[in-house]
A protein has these predicted regions:
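Active-site-proximal beta-strand/loop segments in catalytic clefts of secreted hydrolases
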Residues: 1, 42-45, 81-85, 146-150, ...
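Noncatalytic carbohydrate-binding groove/subsite architecture in carbohydrate-active enzymes
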Residues: 1-59, 74
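Flexible loop/turn segments at secondary-structure boundaries
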Residues: 1-4, 46-51, 86-90, 152-154, ...
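A structural motif corresponding to the C-terminal end of an alpha-helix
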Residues: 22-37, 70-77, 112-115, 204-210
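Aromatic/acidic polysaccharide-binding cleft in carbohydrate-active enzymes
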Residues: 40-135
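C-terminal non-catalytic regions of proteins with extracellular/luminal or membrane-system context
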Residues: 113, 117-123, 156, 188, ...
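Carbohydrate-binding surface patches
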Residues: 126-161, 165-173, 210-217
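Acidic, Ser/Thr/Pro-rich beta/coil linker or hinge segments at domain junctions
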Residues: 159-208
Length: 218
């Protein structure tokens, strides 16, 4: 787990499964000494055994979102990312504080995903990492996070009804330093105003490109 991974492995099941595997290693001890206690991750991201060259690009977003989604299926608690505005994997670019793709991805997670995690009923496999939560806005319904960790194949989602979707992708490639939301670049506006993190209405079939991630609000 604690080792450097090659870029070619970033969408692989072993790589994406590291966070949950680590959490599961400690659940037995937690249950023995502090039954029902929360588990906190005090340093996430590239904090341990780092040196990756893609931490500041969209390529790290599937890992980040998968870590949040899968961690919630093991335990509740808090995940701290190291670091906010220093190093190549900070959420903000050092010196300019320009938001990187992971910043917007985590901001969307916090705006959309509620505190209650549910079993999505869909087994994890290549192209289909699916996580389900209550809605953060308190309304009835559910929010799904779908991560397509295939390098080559689209993931097709059949929407049961009209949904609000937030589809994330790299602007030109996985290693792009700019992320798009429903095809629009996410970048600061005048006076460093945040862009609109707005969803789009969709119904029928939703296609998620290789390496893409989507929040689906139903």
């Amino acid at each position: 787990m604690g080792r450097h991974w090659p870029y070619e492995a970033i969408l692989s099941e072993p790589y994406l499964g590291v966070a949950a595997s680590c959490a599961k290693q400690y659940t037995a001890r937690r249950d023995k000494y502090v039954p029902g206690g929360q588990m906190w991750v005090t340093e996430s991201g590239d904090a341990g055994c780092g040196g990756n060259t893609w931490g500041s690009t969209y390529a790290d977003v599937p890992r980040t979102l998968n870590e949040l989604g899968e961690f919630c299926t093991v335990t509740d608690g808090v995940i701290f990312h190291n670091t906010l505005a220093s190093s190549d994997y900070g959420y903000l670019k050092h010196g300019t504080f320009e938001p990187r793709p992971n910043y917007f991805a985590v901001l969307l997670w916090n705006r959309l995903m509620g505190q209650t995690a549910y079993d999505s009923g869909i087994a994890i496999e290549e192209g289909k990492h699916v996580y389900c939560h209550s809605r953060k806005d308190g309304k009835e319904g559910l929010v799904y996070l779908v991560i397509n960790n295939s390098w080559t194949e689209e993931t097709v989602v059949e929407l049961p009804k009209e949904a609000e979707v937030y589809v994330l992708a790299g602007k030109d490639s996985l290693r792009s330093r700019t992320m798009t939301l429903n095809g629009k670049e996410l970048k600061l506006g005048e006076n460093d105003a945040l862009p609109c993190l707005c969803g789009e209405k969709a119904e029928g079939t939703l296609q998620i490109a290789p390496g893409g991630c989507a929040f689906i609000v139903l």
